[in-house]
C-alpha cells in the first residue's frame, strides 16, 4: 500500500514537469514520458492539464524562454502490472509491448527507450530537483543524516491510528513514526510487525523499532526503503497467513519470462499455503529459505529478486510461528483455522 506518488501527481504536477525539464537539460534530452497507471484517472487528468498550462506559459515546448533548449512531455498509461515498476519492463510498456524486463546489459542509460540512452526515475526523485536547485544542497542536507540527507515521503497503512502520508527526515526510527506521528496501535493492541518498502520489503519485529530508516541501515536487517510504504500489523495477525497473502500476490504478478521467478513464486506460495493449512512438514522452512536465495541470485529482474524478501525476513524474525504451524499444527492467533 503506497500512494505517495499519486499525491504528487495530483497535488503538485508542475513540480514533476519542472524537475523533468531540468533533468532533460542536464542530460541533453528533449523528450520525457510520464508512465501512469490507467486507473489513476484524476492523476492523468491533472497531469494533462498541467502540461497544457506549462506549454501555454512557455515552460515546455520549443526554445524554452529563448534558451535554445526544447523539451516536451508525454503521458503514457499503463495497465497496472506490478512488474512494470522495473525500469526495463516500464520501458517495454511505454513502447507498446508486453510489460516484461529486458536482459541487462545493455542498461537503459546506454540503450533504453526506442534504443536511445534513457534516464528512469521515480516521480518523488524528480519532484525533489527544483527545490534543491532553488535552495541549494546545504539546505537539503539540513534534513536527515550525513549518509542519507533529505526527507522521505512514507505511506502509513495497516493497524495504526493515523493513516496517510507523512514526510519525515531520513533516518527517523520506526518507533517515532508509529507512536509519535502515527498515534500508536488501535484498540490498545501490541505492535507485531512492520513491512517497509512495499510488498517486496522486509518484515521487521518490535526488537527493531529503533532502527533508523535510511538506504543503508534497513538493508542490514533484510529490508529497504523502497517505495516508501509502511504496513503496520498488530498482534492479532498470523505471520504465516500474511506470508501466504504476499506469496499469492507475487505468483500472480510474475510476468513469467524467467524460470526462477515464474516457478519460484509458485512454489513459495504453494509451500506457505500448505503450512497455513496445517499440512507443512519438517524441512519446509529450509526449502523456503533455499528457494528464496536461488531466486535472489538468478531471477532476471527486481521482482523475482525481491519476491522472497518478505518470507526470508519472516523466517528470520518470526520463525516460531511457522514452527508452531508445522510441529504443533497450531496457529497461535487462531487465524488459519487449524
Q: Which residue stretches match the model-derived regions?
A:
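Flexible loop/turn segments at secondary-structure boundaries
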Residues: 1-2, 39-44, 81-84, 90, ...
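Active-site loop ensemble at the mouth of alpha/beta enzyme cores that anchors a bound cofactor
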Residues: 93-105, 207-224
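Ferredoxin-type iron-sulfur electron-transfer modules in oxidoreductases and energy-metabolism complexes
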Residues: 5-9, 30-32, 36, 40, ...
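Short loop-to-beta-strand transition segments
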Residues: 32, 183-198
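Short acidic beta-strand-loop surface patches of small beta-rich interaction domains
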Residues: 41, 158, 191-211
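Short amphipathic, charge-patterned alpha-helical segments
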Residues: 19-23, 171-186
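Histidine-anchored nucleotide/phosphate-binding helix
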Residues: 12-26
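Hydrophobic alpha-helical positions that pack around
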Residues: 44-170, 182
